[in-house]
């Protein structure tokens, strides 16, 4: 799993995510993201079936497939997220990343290749 970090940029995760998605689309990537939903009890869930911890973004621009977990500054990867990323990284040809807002320059580089 490639983890890239540089200087800090103060962004909320949803703003960061929107920026990554916009840039990816601008560079010709197909983007998949399932947004979380707020339940009546005030809990956030992702309304899909599957094991918990699935990464935030799937980016496809043949021949490349990128799987991304996005984190806010100071955000931590959960054990379930780490398990998913490890399993996906073991698949041939899949690139997996954990990106923080401070990684912006490297994100631009990865998505522009």
What name fits each language-model region?
Residues 1-113:
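Catalytic phosphate/metal-binding cores of nucleic-acid and nucleotide-processing enzymes, i.e., regions
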